[in-house]
UniProtKB/Swiss-Prot annotation:
The keyword Cell division applies. It is found in: Cytoplasm. It holds the Pfam family Mur_ligase. A motif (Meso-diaminopimelate recognition motif) lies at residues 407-410. Meso-2,6-diaminopimelate binds at R383, D407, N408, P409, R410, G458, E462. Its cofactor is Mg(2+). This is UDP-N-acetylmuramoyl-L-alanyl-D-glutamate--2,6-diaminopimelate ligase. Transmembrane segments: none annotated. The gene is murE. It comes from Listeria innocua serovar 6a (strain ATCC BAA-680 / CLIP 11262). Belongs to the MurCDEF family. MurE subfamily. Its main location: cytoplasm. The modification N6-carboxylysine is found at K217.
Amino acid sequence: MKLKELMQAIPVYTGEASAAIEVNQIAQDSRKVQPGTLFICIDGEIVDGHQFADRAVQLGAVAIIAEKQLDVSVPVLYVRDSKRAMAMLADYFYGSPTQALKLVGITGTNGKTTVSHLVEQIVRENGEQTGLIGTMYRKIGDEILETKNTTPDSLTLQETFRDMLLSGVSTAVMEVSSHALVQGRVYGSDYDVAVFMNLSQDHLDYHHTMEEYAYAKSLLFAQLGNSYNLSNPKIAVLNADDKESVRMQTATAAHIITFGIKEPADFSASNIQITSHGSTFDLKTPVGDFALKIKMIGNFSVYNVLAAIATSFALRIPVINAIATVESIPGVKGRFELVNAGQDFPVIVDYSHTPDSLLNVLQTIDEFAEKRVFVVVGCGGDRDKGKRPQMAKIAVDYATNPIFTSDNPRSEDPHAIIEDMIQGVPGSDSYVVHENRRDAIRYAVNMAEAGDVILIAGKGHEDYQVIGDEVIDFDDRVEARIAIEKKLGLA
């Protein structure tokens, strides 16, 4: 594509976009530059891409997008916001793929991964080819691709959408993080349905206040647009029980569909019964009432199912079809996932890494636990420190046997992170500390007896642990299974 044509995606810039320059690819990482690359300088939190402009030129960059003045031998086109420019250029370069896809964006503190998987499965079982982008991976049809962030950078995102189209995908479902919204990674993406799950404390190391965090989430709904095309209306699916839904509704001109348990909603649940094997409830919808029996456990699972069914309805999938799918799904990896190696007590691995999600899971366990509740819990390093004492207090308040341990300490001292947690439980003697996560899991398993429940919280599906600069193999589910088998004399 000619540079002059590509720059049509940016309404205002300074510099000369030559019609003679051919652009073969776009990159923001100088290590990926090849001859014919348009290099975009991003001034990031850790690295400033402007410092690598010379290197990009040496590797074959034919032009550069920048915010700061550069002295290089190729044309430089200056923009006000490189991140926004990159997203718009990526969309244009890859042929505006989301205009040809049905695109669902799901945001919120908790539930994004489960709901995205539920919706993707519902759409797939309705006969459509699907794509999925989220915390665990990117998925194009049946092909699984690794991902580094919940929401990839805009170049990767638009390339993925393009590849989805080429593979015959008609509907893409994606998790949209608050970081991605603030950083402009999803600019240029044409959403058909946007879903708001909930808002509770997380990422305040980045957003600083809950007000900023809520504003970040609302950006998805502002981006949803105001198309009133009856054949393809824009729809916002909102949690009626979360007060921040008012903000999301105010931010969009799209049609509104609501779900909830406490407040009146278009899709609501009542007569909820929770057991150690699943949940049952009565579902009220705009097209009738239904009795549901799902294999997922807890009120939070009911919310997730309500959101998935409401979203499917927004996609014009019959409610009865959506119900059939959600009733058949056992759950999502690392989300209230049971580890069974022959022991006589439940061991649950869950991604709950926020105060609200940990509280929800422990309250659910309390509904069926016969005796003691062990919780293995830590907090991530280089992340929101404010939630550490809250996580510890919830563990002490709702579990009989809290075990404080490491999560992904990253560059922080694991001991210091645990000390931050302990600040939330002054005077308590109910917890123990095992800094090594493997030791903490083995301690819980060795202590547990019939009728007890173990929750291993925080990492869920993750199969690694980040300690300093090292990424080591570590999977809570594998470690729990090994510990159980050793206890039972099977290993």
